Amino acid sequence: MAEGSRLYFAVTVLMCAFVSINGVGLNDLLERASQLSDKLHSLSTSLTNDLDSHFPPVGRVMMPRPSMCHTSSLQIPNDKDQALKVPEDELLSLARSLLLAWSDPLALLSSEASSLAHPERNTINSKTKELQDNINSLGAGLERVVHKMGSSSDNLSSLPFYSNSLGQDKTSRLVNFHFLLSCFRRDSHKIDSFLKVLRCRAAKKRPEMC
């Protein structure tokens, strides 16, 4: 089975398990959430590698700085030690805020992927749609975590995304696609880290074991 097929199968199984949850305990919910967020980050990394396989050298020069990511204004822990000091409900809100912030950008990437000037565009298109499905499933799962924890479902940071185009020429579109994906990959790692800290706390492990 090819890498993409294996990853798709694993993500699909996790998604089906997540959306069918009823009466599952908090520990199990967070375990499944952290598994799904890990797949999310793995998929974004795989997509980045696909893009890098045929990326023009000029694209590296044109690439915006990470500080230009639309989620860069969100104040978040920089590492695990800082995350361990953040209250559970706040950490969950940060993960959900980041996840919600990628709804529109991923819709844009999904709509543009099939027409990218890239030899792997079919694979990129397929994986981008998987990302959308993955995010929707994780978002639904985190709503269940909110309910279990008794946290506020409205305590989310607004991180609007205003662009509705990746550019007019093929190079700009490819560069901006890569840039958005790199921003998402960074944020997916943060989401994964936050959920793993929450899972660790729910299991009442010592901080040094997290």
UniProtKB/Swiss-Prot annotation:
Entry keyword set: Disulfide bond, Hormone, Secreted, Signal
A GO term for molecular function: hormone activity
Cited SUPFAM superfamilies: 4-helical cytokines (SSF47266)
Key word Signal present: yes
InterPro entries from the UniProt entry: 4_helix_cytokine-like_core, Somatotropin/Prolactin, Somatotropin_CS
Reported tissue expression: Pituitary gland.
Localization (cell): Secreted
Superkingdom, taxonomy of origin: Eukaryota
GO cellular component entries: extracellular space
BP-aspect Gene Ontology terms: positive regulation of cell population proliferation; positive regulation of receptor signaling pathway via JAK-STAT; response to nutrient levels
Disulfide bonds, paired cysteine numbers: 69-183, 200-210
Signal peptide span: 1-23
PROSITE patterns from the UniProt entry: SOMATOTROPIN_1, SOMATOTROPIN_2
Gene3D superfamilies in the cross-refs: 1.20.1250.10
Record has Disulfide bond as a keyword: yes
Protein family (similarity comment): Belongs to the somatotropin/prolactin family.
PANTHER family named among the record's database cross-references: PROLACTIN, SOMATOTROPIN,PROLACTIN
Protein name: Prolactin
Species of the source: Hypophthalmichthys nobilis
Gene name linked to the record: prl
